[in-house]
From Swiss-Prot:
Keyword Iron: yes
Superkingdom per UniProt: Bacteria
Positions of isopentenyl diphosphate binding: 41, 74, 125, 226-228, 270
InterPro entries: LytB/IspH (IPR003451)
Swiss-Prot/TrEMBL catalytic activity: isopentenyl diphosphate + 2 oxidized [2Fe-2S]-[ferredoxin] + H2O = (2E)-4-hydroxy-3-methylbut-2-enyl diphosphate + 2 reduced [2Fe-2S]-[ferredoxin] + 2 H(+); dimethylallyl diphosphate + 2 oxidized [2Fe-2S]-[ferredoxin] + H2O = (2E)-4-hydroxy-3-methylbut-2-enyl diphosphate + 2 reduced [2Fe-2S]-[ferredoxin] + 2 H(+)
Alphabetical keyword list: 4Fe-4S, Iron, Iron-sulfur, Isoprene biosynthesis, Metal-binding, Oxidoreductase
Binding residues for dimethylallyl diphosphate: 41, 74, 125, 226-228, 270
The species this protein was found in: Yersinia enterocolitica serotype O:8 / biotype 1B (strain NCTC 13174 / 8081)
Name under which the protein is recorded: 4-hydroxy-3-methylbut-2-enyl diphosphate reductase
Transmembrane intervals: none
GO molecular function: 4 iron, 4 sulfur cluster binding; 4-hydroxy-3-methylbut-2-enyl diphosphate reductase activity; metal ion binding
Cofactor note (record): Binds 1 [4Fe-4S] cluster per subunit.
Catalytic center residues: 127 (proton donor)
Length: 317
């Protein structure tokens, strides 16, 4: 039994930046540091930061005056941002992924111009809630769609004054189908110059396509609430391969590997490499011999942390 590793996999630049912001804030200012929502959707990361002194909250009212607050990588609405600024906080840091901020700016621009905006995304996801919350023009409208069926059921005020944008962590294939439906339903709708689905999501889905071509079973390291990790498992399943989303090596069931000659392993954009290494070790303990990393797209994007946090911090294992 051989192990095939998808490439690229694991942390993206936005996740790396968000985690660094929390780590550096703890290092510079000391615990506790308050974070609105899980900074990224990974149980291992959140538990590790909690052990170091991060306190994850959903309501800013839970944050005591004089505290330091960080927004998660998923972004927040204008209302949440205004609420935080009205509080007597010592410091406020924004760990929103810059690629999510780009979508926020598209929505805010549409709101200012009075255009109606349609967001392709998953209801209830914090990124979607934050993005929808950038629109505040009562004369226009902001709508959420998840599928082509939603598009055909949608009622807007002015079909000639529409634009759309997307959540950054969607299935490339599913989103393409929704965009096609939007163009058929609303021929004059305007979209972003470049797809809002981020480079990391696109690259990891492409890597899973390559992986699933050769693997008998695919293991995706990522938490259940991670949108991009779920999309990786779904993609492998659509390609006809058994695929399992796992938080850690402890989740692996031997029955999944029966008769498998090649096990594919990848990781969502919020899953650290240590979890992948533990999965490899577990598979080797179950009889896998060696691992091979597939060729894939090189990623060199780096997002800077806020200037107030640009100091050397201790390396944490």
């Amino acid at each position: 039994m051989q192990i095939l590793l998808a490439n690229p996999r694991g942390f993206c630049a936005g996740v790396d930046r968000a985690i660094s912001i929390v780590e550096r804030a703890i290092e510079m200012y000391g615990a506790p540091i308050y974070v609105r929502h899980e900074v990224v959707h990974n149980r291992y990361v959140v538990d590790s930061l909690r052990e170091r002194g991060a306190i994850f909250i959903e309501d800013i009212a839970e944050v005591p005056d004089g505290s330091i607050l960080i927004f998660s990588a998923h972004g927040v609405s204008q209302a949440v941002r205004a609420e935080a600024r009205a509080r007597e906080l010592t410091m406020l840091f924004d760990a929103t992924c810059p690629l999510v901020t780009k979508v926020h700016m598209e929505v805010a621009r549409a709101s200012r111009k009075g255009k109606e905006a349609i967001l392709i995304g998953h209801a209830g996801h914090p990124e979607v809630e934050g993005t929808m919350g950038q629109y505040n023009n009562p004369k226009g409208g902001m709508y959420l769609v998840e599928s082509p069926d939603d598009v055909w059921k949608l009622n807007v005020k002015d079909e000639n004054n529409l634009c759309f944008m997307t959540q950054t962590t969607l299935s490339v294939d599913d989103t393409s189908a929704v965009i096609d439906a939007l163009h058929r339903r609303f021929p004059k709708i305007i979209g972003p110059r470049k797809d809002d689905i981020c480079y990391a999501t696109t690259n990891r889905q492409e890597a899973v396509r390559n992986l699933a071509n050769d693997a008998d079973v695919v293991l995706v390291v990522g938490s259940k609430n991670s949108s991009n990790s779920n999309r990786l498992a779904e993609l492998a399943q659509r390609m006809g391969k058994p695929a399992y989303l796992i938080d850690s090596a402890a989740d692996i069931q031997e029955s999944w590997l029966q008769n498998a000659k090649c096990i594919g392993v990848t990781a969502g954009a919020s899953a650290p490499d240590i979890l992948v290494q533990q999965v490899i070790a577990r598979l080797q303990a179950l009889g896998a011999v060696g691992s091979v990393e597939l060729r894939g797209r090189e990623e060199s994007i780096v997002f800077e942390v806020p200037k107030e946090l640009r100091v050397e911090v201790k390396q944490v294992d």
